[in-house]
């Protein structure tokens, strides 16, 4: 599944300090995004190329040939959130998450509670004489690692609650419209009740952190390991 979307996610993470992340995300949004998710490549291959192998054997809009591989979408969600593009990350999450696709179930067709391996891309159906008539149709239910990867994307990258060597790191990358969020996380023998406030309505950035009412430096919560519940108050800014 080495593709435009995978290369894009790597560039966002590797080259963030050089500003390549913003250019890459803009190109991804312009060239790969659709209302049903991100296609792997664009345009689709229309004939077989021996040097490219399997990718060019599939009909346009299916599988690796410009299909919407949901597994790869999760990697772009992670990359967008890492780059601080919280609105973009959540938009991509909403395009493929089953909870958001009920209104298009007549197009999607697969079970409304599960991820499929892929969704028909913009070119899907052109092989049977009617361009794009399978665009948005889900395929191969359950046959994917998307659920696990999107759990990582939403919890560790968008909500920004992730394990760190020194403790529990809180670094949200959320839509600017959000006032904040709450979460409970069990971590290394303790429970953390986390409340994040976003008064400035930004996408990313932590201004202050209180743990059990006491200010700490940075945004990594110590691992108490005492079996107790600790309150964490985070203000973005």
Segments predicted by a language model, with ranges:
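Single conserved hydrophobic/aromatic residue that forms the stacking wall/gate
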Residues: 1-13
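Contiguous, well-ordered alpha-helical segments that form the cores/surfaces of helical PPI scaffolds
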Residues: 9-10, 71-78
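Alpha-helix C-terminal capping segments
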Residues: 14-15, 82
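Carboxylate/His-rich catalytic cores and anion/metal-binding grooves
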Residues: 18-37
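Conserved active-site and cofactor/substrate-binding residues in soluble primary-metabolism enzymes
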Residues: 19, 23, 71, 87, ...
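Non-catalytic C-terminal accessory modules of carbohydrate-active enzymes
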Residues: 30-34, 46-49, 57-66, 75-237
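Short, surface-exposed loop/turn segments at secondary-structure boundaries that line and modulate
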Residues: 54
């Amino acid at each position: 599944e080495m593709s435009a979307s995978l290369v894009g996610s790597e560039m966002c993470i590797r080259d963030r300090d050089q500003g390549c992340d913003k250019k890459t995300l803009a190109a991804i949004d312009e060239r790969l995004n659709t209302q049903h998710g991100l296609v792997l490549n664009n345009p689709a291959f229309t004939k077989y190329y021996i040097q490219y192998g399997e990718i060019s054997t599939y009909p346009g809009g299916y599988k690796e040939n410009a299909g919407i591989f949901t597994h790869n979408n999760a990697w772009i969600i992670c990359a967008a959130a890492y780059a601080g593009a919280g609105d973009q990350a959540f938009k991509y999450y909403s395009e493929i998450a089953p909870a958001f696709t009920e209104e298009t179930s007549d197009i999607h067709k697969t079970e409304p509670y599960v991820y499929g391996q892929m969704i028909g891309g913009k070119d899907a159906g052109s092989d049977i004489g009617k361009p794009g008539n399978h665009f948005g149709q889900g395929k191969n239910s359950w046959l994917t690692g998307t659920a696990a990867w999107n759990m990582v994307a939403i919890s560790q990258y968008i909500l920004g609650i992730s394990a760190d060597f020194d403790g529990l790191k809180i670094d949200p990358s959320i839509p600017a419209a959000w006032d904040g969020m709450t979460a409970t996380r069990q971590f290394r023998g303790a429970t953390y009740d986390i409340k994040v406030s976003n008064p400035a309505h930004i996408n990313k950035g932590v201004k202050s952190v209180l743990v059990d009412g006491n200010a700490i430096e940075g945004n990594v919560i110590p691992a108490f390991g005492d079996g107790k519940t600790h309150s964490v108050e985070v203000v973005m800014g």
